[in-house]
Regions:
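Substrate-recognition "cap/lid" segment bordering the active-site pocket of phosphatases
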Residues: 59, 82, 87-139, 145-154
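Glycine-rich phosphate-binding loop signature in dinucleotide/nucleotide-binding domains
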Residues: 74-79, 130-136, 191-194
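Acidic, Mg2+-coordinating phosphoryl-transfer loop and its flanking beta/alpha structural elements
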Residues: 140-178
Length: 213
């Protein structure tokens, strides 16, 4: 749609938002008007994903994720789930549906690449949609250093799962790092208990020791 020749661009994608990735791709191909034509670019990307994505993505869900989601969903008084992703929301919702985990995430909740090109802005957006959910009761769970960075930008806790894209060592800046999502449940329970106390993780406060992984 930009009249540009296809190219193999060396554009980093892990943990970035779709808008940021698309801007870099179009710029690398010689385009300069991606912002002016952003609605068209986004619409084309969504249509392409709908056409090209496999109908069944369940095998691509990281080990332990379904079990963790199920355990958290069974405790609505303690935990509230919201999706935080760099994907455009229609792409994210389609991914979840085809991975058979969409029912764990309420509509009109979460933060998406559709909301802002900067991932660091998404946790605050998700908390606002959850009725001003407090920082001290918020945990970002991710598998890239950018997931950790976006949590730090909003001054909330972050737990990392080494799904294979990045190692435990590369994710060591998180408050907790595990190699299987199921191991996060006791960590989240302990953080939930802390969240009820006056202690916090606001900037300038002492960070709590990392749970053993």
């Amino acid at each position: 749609m930009h009249g540009l020749a296809p190219l193999e661009a060396d554009v980093e994608v892990a943990g970035r938002t779709d808008p940021a990735i698309m801007r870099d791709l179009v710029t690398a191909a010689g385009g300069a008007d991606v912002d002016a034509r952003w609605p068209e670019v986004a619409e084309a990307a969504i249509a392409a994903y709908e056409q090209l994505a496999p109908d069944d993505l369940s095998e691509r869900v990281a080990p332990g994720i379904v079990e963790l989601l199920e355990a958290l969903a069974e405790r609505p008084a303690e935990f509230r789930l919201a999706l935080l992703t760099g994907n455009l929301e229609p792409i994210a919702r389609l991914k979840l549906a085809r991975a058979a985990i969409g029912h764990y995430f309420e509509p009109e909740q979460g933060g998406y690449g559709s909301d802002h090109h900067d991932r660091a802005e998404l946790p605050a957006i998700a908390r606002e949609r959850a009725g001003g959910w407090p920082r001290e009761r918020t945990v970002v769970i991710g598998d890239t250093p950018r997931d950790i960075a976006c949590a730090r930008a909003d001054d909330v806790r972050v737990a990392a799962v080494a799904t294979g894209l990045f190692s435990v060592e590369q994710l060591a800046d998180a408050d907790a790092v595990v190699d299987d999502a199921r191991a996060l449940l006791p960590v989240l329970h302990s953080w939930h208990s802390w969240g009820q106390s006056p202690l916090g993780t606001r900037r300038g406060s002492q960070r709590r020791p990392k749970p053993q992984t």
